[in-house]
């Protein structure tokens, strides 16, 4: 079949920041980046020069590197960002309690056009680390280390109907640590989470670092964590993604069994393949015939 074509490694002009970016999303030719930083500067500018103030969120043109005026503000780190299906709204999650100087308990929404606040009926009592919009655009999944959303019990994962702005009945019980990533199957049949959690509702096979749920929140009993077991204080599934071929996961581990990229079957949880390279893996992206990974892999 030959080698599939990939994007090049050619450098593009990219805006710089004075801190760290934890997540980003691309809408059209605009990159929206969030994390913990207070200033942004043009590509090529040394640190401290030509800086413009930002408060943990910024945007730039992916082709030219031009910094845009989009500049929502928060009083704490933003860990996650997701775009609505139409690209007009951006959802933010993190450690903050204010968004654009108004109360926002660790999750909120802003307009992609100007960064002004948009309505979102959600508030979390603990850190939000993951956000994901369903393929049909109707549901926002929220993951992290919280135990309540809108004063209703939700153990580290929840789902919000974006039409009604109400919580759905999706309420798995993640027993400890946190949820780091969430994705819904492309056909809408199931939801997967990855993180540092060691069990789900008392089950660790499946339920250790990665788990697949029915749409009603019940745990799909399969082999998802029978082979790869990385969770707890020093291991985590950092990213889960989906396409028509399966469920992809990337992990890091100091004490677990795997720190590469793998693809699983949504129904059985069986592993289709594992890229068993040593070196922590932080993100994975299936793109047609190619799967990209962000890692410091070695010894492949």
Segments and roles (model prediction):
Residues 1-300:
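Extracytoplasmic surface signature
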């Amino acid at each position: 079949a030959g080698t599939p074509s990939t994007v090049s490694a050619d450098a593009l002009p990219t805006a710089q920041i004075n801190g760290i970016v934890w997540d980003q999303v691309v809408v059209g030719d605009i990159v929206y980046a969030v994390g913990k930083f207070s200033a942004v500067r043009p590509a090529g500018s040394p640190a401290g020069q030509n800086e413009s103030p930002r408060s943990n969120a910024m945007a730039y043109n992916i082709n030219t590197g031009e910094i845009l005026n989009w500049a929502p503000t928060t009083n704490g780190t933003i860990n996650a960002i997701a775009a609505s299906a139409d690209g007009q709204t951006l959802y933010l999650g993190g450690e903050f309690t204010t968004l654009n100087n108004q109360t926002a308990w660790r999750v909120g929404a802003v307009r992609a056009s100007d960064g002004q606040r948009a309505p979102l009926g959600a508030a979390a009592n603990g850190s939000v680390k993951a956000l994901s919009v369903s393929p049909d655009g109707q549901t926002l999944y929220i993951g992290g280390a919280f135990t309540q959303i809108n004063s209703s019990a939700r153990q580290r994962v929840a789902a919000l109907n974006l039409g009604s702005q109400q919580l759905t009945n999706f309420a798995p019980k993640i027993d400890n640590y946190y949820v780091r990533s969430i994705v819904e199957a492309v056909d809408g049949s199931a939801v997967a989470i990855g993180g540092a959690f060691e069990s789900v509702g008392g089950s660790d096979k499946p339920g250790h670092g990665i788990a697949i749920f029915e749409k009603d929140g019940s745990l799909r009993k399969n082999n998802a964590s029978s082979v790869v077991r990385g969770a707890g204080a020093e291991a985590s599934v950092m990213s889960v993604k989906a396409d028509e071929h399966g469920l992809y996961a990337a992990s890091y581990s100091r004490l677990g069994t795997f720190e590469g990229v793998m693809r699983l079957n949504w129904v059985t949880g069986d592993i289709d393949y594992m890229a068993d390279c040593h070196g922590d893996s932080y993100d994975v992206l299936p793109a047609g015939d190619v799967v990209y990974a962000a890692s410091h892999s070695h010894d492949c």
